[in-house]
């Protein structure tokens, strides 16, 4: 479980950085997944579509489990209700079922087991004057529209204007990059939290240090395999097609003689 020691009730822009293979995407995914599981309202059978009301365990239920020698895990233990009567019981979430959660999630990389919407730059631009992307998580993994090298383009400038509305939109933004210096300055200025990751291949632990605007540094960790099933660890995040087309056009443009 990723330990989130800052208030999710407030809008936040987190910059998650670290070298390749440091667990950046794992941590970003963990923050989103943990929030969805903490607010789950049901579970759905992926084969039959059957729906069962469910909820996360409360503090007393967690203590009761642990008093029996059972180690509680947010992603495993839930209370499920009967579809016949009002009875319920604590179970380990069965295989083949995904959670139903009111938490809204927008990402530029694929997630599994969590309801979300894949978005590109055009989705952000098109929603800048409406409330489509509000009260939600917005995670951008090594995205071209936060890249410092493109900081003077109209695209990045417009996305930056959108990010400036993060608090009013109640967004929990995560920008992922190998180095914070690779992110356009505007986003650095808007950031409220910096997270630096490192990964231990022997223990499968992602260690991370969190600092916020109060200069308080906190260290924590998570067990990476708990979250690998929620995303493709080797997914290649696609670049906007118009940028690819533009470069190809320039490459194959006849040379002047």
Features from the language model and the residues they span:
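Hydrophobic anchor at the beta1->P-loop junction of P-loop NTPases
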Residues: 16
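Conserved lysine of the Walker
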Residues: 24-25
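Conserved P-loop NTPase motor module
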Residues: 1, 193-195, 207-257
């Amino acid at each position: 479980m990723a330990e989130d020691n800052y208030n999710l009730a407030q809008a936040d822009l987190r910059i998650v950085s670290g070298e390749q293979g440091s667990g950046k995407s794992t941590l970003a995914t963990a923050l989103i997944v943990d929030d969805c599981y903490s607010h789950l309202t049901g579970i759905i059978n992926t084969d039959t579509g059957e729906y069962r009301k469910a909820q996360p365990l409360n503090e007393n239920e967690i203590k009761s489990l642990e008093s029996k020698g059972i180690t509680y895990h947010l992603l495993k233990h839930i209370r499920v209700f009967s579809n016949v009567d009002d009875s319920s019981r604590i179970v380990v979430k069965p295989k083949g079922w995904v959670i139903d959660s009111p938490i809204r999630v927008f990402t530029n990389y694929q997630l599994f087991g969590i309801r979300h919407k894949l978005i590109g730059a055009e989705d952000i631009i098109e929603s800048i004057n409406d409330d489509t992307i509000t009260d939600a998580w917005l995670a951008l993994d090594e995205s071209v529209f936060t890249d410092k090298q493109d900081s003077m383009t109209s695209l990045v400038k417009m996305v930056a204007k959108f990010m400036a509305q993060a608090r009013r939109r109640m967004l929990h933004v995560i920008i992922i990059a190998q180095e914070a210096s690779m992110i356009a300055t505007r986003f650095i200025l808007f950031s409220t939290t910096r997270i630096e990751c490192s990964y231990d291949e022997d223990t499968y632990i992602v260690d991370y240090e969190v600092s916020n605007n109060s200069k308080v540094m906190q260290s924590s960790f998570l067990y990476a395999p708990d979250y690998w099933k929620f995303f493709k660890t080797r997914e290649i995040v696609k670049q906007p097609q118009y940028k690819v087309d533009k470069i190809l056009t320039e490459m194959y443009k006849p040379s002047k003689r």
